[in-house]
């Protein structure tokens, strides 16, 4: 922190002790996951990574990695790298929709739409994005759209429900400070972000709408134990508890039965959790950012040179999620963290609805399912 600069010149004379929150065992657990992943990714590429884990409730940094340990440099990718987040940005679109009172049962057509963007020459060109698996379909709920990370649903959301400016405003309210371009392609996470910012921002969902600024040093002492400076936790409410919970619940669907499902069936992580996979257009970035009620963490893998791909099939759920799973599983076990559930606020209710119509059941209803709603948009 810049506040330390005035004391820096006296470091040697006064033998200052910086008391940090970093947990050595947490860093060791992440490094183990990092090394394991490098062996699986393409060895001929200089694959880099960034990782950061925060206390969900306070923003205290538990562990951080700014690059691969066998190729040291002074560039901390966790705090300095600007990378496209891909689908990791989609929760901000859904947050904007929920904040505008759209229920998660809102249905949009899972069919191609055209966008316009500037090409490398600065010229406007037509662009028709698709879902990562090339699939299309019929009417699709917002929940299914995020669960399956459907690009076409995200694009239709910014064209039909929440315009790019509203999505940008939500991201900024949730403390994303890097420039966000308020254009239709915001739906696919094309504006660069810093890993530390998006991880801290995600913790807001799990912390009932309260954003906590990341903090690495709690206080500075001299050799006699006298406190020279203390750093306090900095928090503010940026979302309502209801909006935060609804997005949390959507992100739980992602890891329970969506694109992050391997967290459960393959890596056996059993704590209540939410998260999102992310992959950029040419597979140059692979992300997984997620949280439990106690720890929020994010993993990024990529090449420093933006144009170089990680290789075929290296999606966020394949390249980044395994390291996240290894760290979170070990951290929760080693720290004996209980399987706390996300608290449902008073303004959110669970309602039984018709599985086909997504409305209240009638005498023609064949199948039922339960869904969460804000009290203000429960089906009538």
Regions found by a protein language model. Give the residues of each.
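Active-site SXXK
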Residues: 58-59, 82-111, 145, 201-205, ...
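A penicillin-recognizing enzyme superfamily signal
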Residues: 5-55, 64, 70-78, 89, ...
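Conserved catalytic neighborhood of penicillin-recognizing serine enzymes
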Residues: 102-167, 211, 221-253
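Short, well-ordered junction/capping motifs at the entry into regular secondary structure
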Residues: 1-2, 188
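Second-shell loop/turn segments in exported
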Residues: 37-40, 75-83, 128-133, 141-143, ...
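Mid-domain, small-residue-enriched loop/turn segments at the edges of structured enzyme/sensor domains
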Residues: 122-129, 161-200, 209, 213-216
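Proteins synthesized as precursors that undergo proteolytic processing into mature forms
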Residues: 71-72, 83, 98, 104-105, ...
């Amino acid at each position: 922190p810049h506040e330390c600069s005035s004391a820096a010149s006296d470091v040697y004379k006064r033998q200052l002790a910086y008391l940090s929150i970093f947990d050595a065992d947490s860093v060791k657990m992440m490094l183990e996951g990092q090394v394991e992943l490098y062996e699986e990714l393409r060895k001929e590429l200089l694959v880099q990574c960034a990782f950061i884990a925060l206390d969900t409730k306070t923003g205290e940094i538990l562990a951080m990695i700014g690059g691969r340990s066998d190729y040291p440099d002074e560039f901390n990718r966790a705090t300095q790298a600007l990378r496209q987040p891909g689908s990791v940005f989609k929760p901000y679109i859904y947050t904007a929709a929920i904040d505008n009172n759209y229920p998660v049962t809102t249905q949009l057509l899972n069919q191609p739409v055209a966008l316009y963007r500037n090409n490398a020459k600065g010229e406007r060109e037509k662009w028709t994005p698709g879902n990562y698996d090339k699939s299309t379909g019929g009417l699709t709920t917002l929940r299914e759209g995020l669960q399956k990370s459907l690009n076409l649903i995200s694009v239709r959301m910014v064209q039909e429900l929440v315009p790019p400016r509203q999505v940008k405003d939500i991201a900024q309210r949730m403390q994303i400070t890097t420039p966000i371009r308020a254009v239709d392609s915001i739906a696919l996470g094309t504006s660069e972000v810093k890993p530390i910012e998006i991880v801290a921002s995600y913790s807001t969902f799990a912390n009932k709408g309260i954003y906590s600024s990341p903090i690495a040093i709690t206080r500075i002492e001299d050799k006699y134990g006298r406190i020279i400076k203390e750093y306090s936790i900095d928090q503010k409410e940026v979302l309502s508890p209801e909006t935060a919970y609804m997005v949390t619940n959507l992100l739980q669907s992602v890891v329970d039965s969506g694109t992050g499902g391997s967290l459960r069936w393959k890596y056996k992580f059993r704590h209540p959790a939410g998260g999102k996979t992310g992959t950029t257009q040419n597979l140059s970035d692979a992300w997984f950012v997620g949280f439990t009620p106690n720890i929020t963490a994010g993993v990024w893998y990529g090449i420093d040179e933006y144009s170089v791909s990680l290789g075929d099939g290296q999606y966020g759920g394949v390249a980044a999620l395994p390291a996240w799973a290894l760290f979170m599983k070990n951290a929760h076990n080693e720290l004996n963290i209980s399987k706390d559930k996300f608290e449902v606020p008073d303004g959110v209710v669970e309602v039984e609805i018709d599985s086909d119509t997504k409305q209240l059941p009638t005498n023609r209803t064949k199948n039922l399912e339960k869904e969460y709603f804000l009290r203000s948009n429960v089906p009538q």
